[in-house]
Amino acid sequence: MRIQTRMGAVLAALVLCTWFLMGCSQTADALDSSASEPPVVLVIGATGRTGNSILAALGDDYRIRALVRDLDRARAKLPANVTLFLGDVRQPETLTSAFEGARFVVSAVGARFVGKGDLADPMNTTELVDYEGVKHLAGAARSAGVEHFVLVSAMGVTRLGGAHDRMDNIMHWKLKGENALRASGVPYTIVRPGGLSDEAGGTLGTLVAQGDNQGPGQTNRIDVARICVRALTDPAARNVTVEVVKDASQPVVPPDGDIFAGLKVDVP
């Protein structure tokens, strides 16, 4: 009787050990699978022309999410591999789910104008989108533990009073949005392009500079998008602000290389 009891105990122990080892194996497999999956990047402003270029530049290296205000419009415009999240940068309570699990964020959001100084949406002002909206995004990124946030701003934001400022003080509010991101504590890169064009990327020289003292100029969206994507994983781009403008004397934006080498980190 004692032998049978001991044998039963041994068998029970063996069964428990087997279950434990199988559970550990399945957990390890799940972790390995998770580790091998591409990182998640959340794109804001994805339905715009610059946002579309960013999606293309991300390619297959990332699992891509897009924060959108209109799901039907986004489904019609965006690739099928983009996971859509309904939200509005003006309403911080709508941002949480899109940011959960995101490792990177790229924002090309901006107030949209129709005509000269006329807003497409009375509530789509530069103050509410380019400042308050970016501030909300930075707060959501901080809460979610985002590793790097790339913001597309505009060249000339520190030189107020120009023609663009006649449109709802756009440069003033973009600069405040930049400063809100800097103050958030989230690692960032701020990319300030010149006037955006839709020329083919990788064909014209591009100057990547600092100081916001470049003359007026154009930048094509594809090169801006490539620079944004490169900034996500380049340590030299951490907490850096750059201006980007076409310059025939400069090299084209390469598929790899040191775009951010030697640039100065922002001073708090």
Q: Model regions: which residues?
A:
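Conserved cofactor-binding/catalytic machinery of classical short-chain dehydrogenase/reductase
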Residues: 91, 133, 177, 220-223
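Glycine-/Pro-rich loop/turn segments that contact NAD(P) or position catalytic residues
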Residues: 111-216
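N-terminal Rossmann NAD(P)H-binding glycine-rich loop of SDR-like oxidoreductase domains
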Residues: 34-60
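Active-site-lining helix/loop region of Rossmann-like oxidoreductase modules
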Residues: 29, 35, 46, 118, ...
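Bacterial N-terminal signal peptides
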Residues: 11-22
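Bacterial N-terminal signal peptides that target proteins for export
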Residues: 2-11
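NAD(P)H-binding glycine-rich loop region in Rossmannoid oxidoreductase-like domains
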Residues: 41-42, 46, 66-143
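Bacterial signal peptide processing site
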Residues: 25-26
